[in-house]
């Protein structure tokens, strides 16, 4: 009997918590039949706390990532690539529900997100590469553009035991009326090439996300968030082909796969 009472008490304690945890899932979607796809538009009920979390997650996960080992291309060489970015979100949480509008009440944003990217990189010197990327959701109102610079401090090809580099990047969110978002990234990466073709690597660093609200429906202060991250991956370079797989661990975990051509 005592065990039964303990189980009952535990169940009574858990049920409200479960109900609270699922409360966000019952949040109604904000609907505008004029949009073709889920688009960024702030609802009047968006709070400062939810906006802060959105800035951290959206800004960091969309930031320009290396998706390459810290191995420089070399002067005069260049690379073009197509990349797939995958990550998951809590799409019914306030920070995502109150920042998006939907074509109808059944058209969820979805927890699993995927975006293709176009990238290019050029070797300015043997130790300095400059790169850029671009993507957008063609049926929605957001996309991103980014620039980066990679400087090699140590190069395994020149006798060092590993390749060591520093990287800086800038990412701008495009086409959104309700906010201006810019993200700066600073990283240090190290990798070691095996068998002259495969380079496992790791990066550590942080994103600085600056999100300025510009909506007519809310009055929120600008958020400046420092979001640390680590990432690991491996790059296979053979002939004129580069294949990369990378995992980025931060407020949101993301996965990148890239295939490119080297010239």
Functional labels for PLM-detected ranges:
Residues 74-76, 111-118, 140-145, 180-184, ...:
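Residues that define the transmembrane beta-barrel architecture of outer-membrane proteins
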Residues 92-97, 133, 142-147, 175-181, ...:
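Outer-membrane beta-barrel translocator domains and adjoining extracellular loop/strand segments
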Residues 126-130, 156-159, 197-200, 238-244:
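Repeated loop/turn-to-beta-strand initiation elements of outer-membrane beta-barrel proteins
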């Amino acid at each position: 009997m005592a065990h039964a009472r303990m189980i009952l008490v535990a169940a009574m304690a858990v049920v409200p918590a479960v109900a609270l945890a699922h409360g966000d899932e019952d949040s109604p979607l904000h609907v505008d039949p004029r949009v073709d796809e889920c688009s960024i538009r702030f609802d009047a009920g968006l709070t400062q706390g939810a906006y802060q979390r959105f800035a951290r997650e959206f800004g960091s996960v969309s930031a320009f990532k290396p998706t390459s080992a810290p191995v420089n291309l070399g002067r005069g060489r260049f690379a073009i690539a197509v990349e797939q970015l995958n990550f998951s979100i809590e799409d019914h949480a306030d920070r995502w529900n109150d920042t998006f509008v939907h074509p109808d009440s059944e058209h969820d944003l979805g927890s699993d997100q995927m975006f293709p990217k176009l990238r290019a990189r050029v070797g300015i010197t043997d130790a300095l590469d400059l790169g850029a990327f671009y993507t957008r959701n063609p049926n929605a109102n957001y996309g991103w553009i980014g620039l980066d610079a990679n400087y090699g401090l140590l190069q395994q090809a020149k006798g060092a035991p590993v390749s060591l580099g520093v990287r800086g990047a800038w990412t701008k969110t495009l086409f959104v009326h309700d906010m201006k978002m810019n993200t700066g990234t600073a990283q240090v990466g190290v990798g070691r090439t095996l068998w002259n073709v495969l380079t496992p690597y790791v990066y550590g660093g942080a994103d600085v996300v600056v999100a300025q609200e510009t909506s007519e429906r809310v009055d929120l202060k600008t958020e400046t968030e420092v979001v640390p991250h680590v990432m690991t991956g491996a790059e296979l370079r053979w002939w004129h082909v580069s294949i990369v797989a990378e995992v980025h661990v931060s407020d949101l975990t993301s996965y990148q796969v890239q295939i490119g051509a080297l010239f």
